[in-house]
């Protein structure tokens, strides 16, 4: 009897340790901080797949603003760019992408100033939407400086709290349609 109870306890412990949480795209924005290092399943429509590497996918819910950033895991092939608009079911661990505070912005700003204006620097609009910032079209200002300014405004709106961005490190996915 003791062996049976021990076996049941061991199985329950293993199952609870490997718990996978299902979250919607909208829930991810508010729950990601509590889910760091945990495995999640997120289902959403591929709004954009990075055109440079194909290793970054942005999931959305049609008609909603929220986005979830998904990176391919180690050893995975890039996402297929022709699947933009398809529904993905992604499994992976939640991780912190970056913590943006005043020190981070000061360092970034110094790097931009030292490197000079970068003609033709492209800022991915989808990435900015995922970060929750809105860049105003200003052709006279360096796009990176616009981005820094927008982050400072967002930090001020948050009462000085840093901006923490999260992503899902994909371990597997399926395309549903």
Question: Which role fits each region the language model picked out?
Answer:
Residues 17-177:
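OB-fold and OB-like single-stranded nucleic-acid-recognition modules
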Residues 1-15:
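Sec-dependent bacterial lipoprotein signal peptides
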